[in-house]
C-alpha cells in the first residue's frame, strides 16, 4: 500500500515540537530553552486564549457541553470541564475536536511572527493533534509515573481516582520516547535538566543552520 506524501514544508524557521505527559516537566524544559533566548510557543497558554469570554472557542465549548462549564462571571470553569472530559473519553474527543484546530492555528500564527534560528513549540498532544507533521524535530519530556502522580496531587489537588483517569488517557512515556527524535529525562535534578537542554540547544542550532543553508 502506498503511503501518503508528507505535507509540504511551508514554514521557514526550524521548529522543534516539545511534547510529554501531564506533569512531566514540559514547562520547566521550555523555560530552560527560553532562558537561552529561544522563542517558545506554548499551546497550553494558547488553549486558554482561545476560550476567553466572548471568543468563538468558548461559544463552541458551551454549545457542546452546556452552560454548566461556565463560572458565574461567564468565564470557562476549567477544573469542572477537565473533570468531565477525563471521566468520559468520548467527551474528551469531542472537546479536542472543537479546540485543537483553533489552538494549532494560533500556534501557526505566532510561529510566523517569531524569529529563529529555531523555535520550540510545546504541544502536549503533538501526535494526537497531527501537529507532528508541522515540526522538523520532536523532543519528548518524560519522568516516572510515580513522580507525575506526586506532582499532580501537589499542583492541582486532584484525588487519586482523577489522577489515574488523567494518566490512563495519556500516551505512555515509553511510546513518546520511541517516536521522538530526542528525549529529556526530567526525573533528576534541575541542574541535570538544564545541562541536557544546553546540549540539545547546540544540536538544534546546528540543524537549523543546516536547514537554512
What are these regions (language model features)?
Residues 1-76, 198, 202-213:
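Glycine-rich phosphate-binding loop of ATP-dependent small-molecule kinases
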Residues 21, 64, 84, 98, ...:
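Amphipathic alpha-helical segments that mediate coupling or scaffolding at interfaces
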Residues 25, 44, 95, 120, ...:
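Residue-level signal for inorganic ion chemistry
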Residues 45-48, 143-146, 165-168, 190:
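Short, acidic/turn-prone active-site loops that include or flank metal/cofactor-
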Residues 45-118:
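ATP-dependent small-molecule kinase phosphotransfer cores
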Residues 58-62, 145-153, 160, 164:
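An amphipathic alpha-helix signature
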Residues 104-113, 118-154:
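ATP-dependent NMP and nucleoside kinases share a basic, alpha-helical "lid"
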Residues 106-107, 133-134, 154-205, 212-213:
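Small-molecule kinase domains that catalyze NTP-dependent phosphoryl transfer to phosphate-bearing small molecules
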